[in-house]
Amino acid sequence: MSALGAVIALLLWGQLFAVDSGNDVTDIADDGCPKPPEIANGYVEHLVRYQCKKYYRLRTEGDGVYTLNNEKQWTNKAVGDKLPECEAVCGKPKNPANPVQRILGGHLDAKGSFPWQAKMVSRHNLTTGATLINEQWLLTTAKNLFLNHSENATAKDIAPTLTLYVGKNQLVEIEKVVLYPNYSQVDIGLIKLKDKVPVNERVMPICLPSKDYAEVGRVGYVSGWGRNANFKFTDHLKYVMLPVADQYQCVKHYEGSTVPEKKTPKSPVGQQPILNEHTFCAGMSKYQEDTCYGDAGSAFAVHDLEEDTWYAAGILSFDKSCGVAEYGVYVKATSIQDWVQKTIAEN
């Protein structure tokens, strides 16, 4: 079991460990703990229940309850002597975001509203975003990873040049970077940390969805460390509430798509985004609020009211709209879900 998700064993009758051998109860631990009274035509069964620390949950087929058998082994009815594991809770921020906040020159993130938001600093001190998806892995864009690197750079070249912060400026070490196989069309990369991060109210992964939340009109929240209304990088995490836009209108607005993304005078911002079946667009809010340079890599976070859980519907790829163009562009989480799971399992 991971030290970060260490279980707490709660024992019936304090620290008593005993086994019923016919009519005799044999102590195997704490002599200072009294035996429970015996009853006629019955016997004492001693149990242990595993529970997880706050912000973790049991990952097991059983119920976490183990009994001591005649061989002095603790076993669970469902999983035998296999011990349960504690995994990090995802998508349950302590202080969920409130409506109508903004990234471009607006209100600050409340403590713990976006605990999955990470700040990544690339070579030459450029700030970008990344999104924590479990205790040891983050999603960001391939373009973020390649900032100030040549197109011939490898993942091994890139990893040592990055600096990453989670929570309240908690520096974490990067073990490796993994790029999506076709990252020129699907602008995504994964970052693996050297160690798992302890999960708490300031550091918590967002959940990846099993269904597509990028429906036209659905509202999501995007947090970020990118440039503000004065085009200066902010020292404080900010966020904005944006609606998913009609894809056809988005493509029409940018007059098409380029793969990979490139500069063009046709675009309202002088640069053409990647637009395909793996992307969706989000428009500006009714207050003309928007994302901007440096926000890429952040999640388009949606709140599933029925589950009371926050999911990453997508990852911001094109962050150059900055209130000038009408749409930001995001990579769909459902398009990369299988690759993410496979990559994490293999690494």
From Swiss-Prot:
Residues 31-88 form the Sushi domain. Disulfide bonds join 52-86, 90-207, 250-281, 292-322. Residues 259-264 are annotated as: Interaction with CD163. One of its GO terms (cellular component) is blood microparticle. One of its GO terms (biological process) is acute-phase response. Keywords: Acute phase, Antibiotic, Antimicrobial, Antioxidant, Disulfide bond, Glycoprotein, Hemoglobin-binding, Immunity, Secreted, Serine protease homolog, Signal, Sushi. Residues 1-18 form the signal peptide. Its main location: secreted. It is found in: Secreted. Residues 103-345 form the Peptidase S1 domain. GO terms for molecular function: antioxidant activity; hemoglobin binding. Pfam families: Trypsin. Tetramer of two alpha and two beta chains; disulfide-linked. The hemoglobin/haptoglobin complex is composed of a haptoglobin dimer bound to two hemoglobin alpha-beta dimers. Interacts with CD163. Interacts with ERGIC3. Belongs to the peptidase S1 family. The beta chain mediates most of the interactions with both subunits of hemoglobin, while the alpha chain forms the homodimeric interface. This is Haptoglobin. The gene is HP.
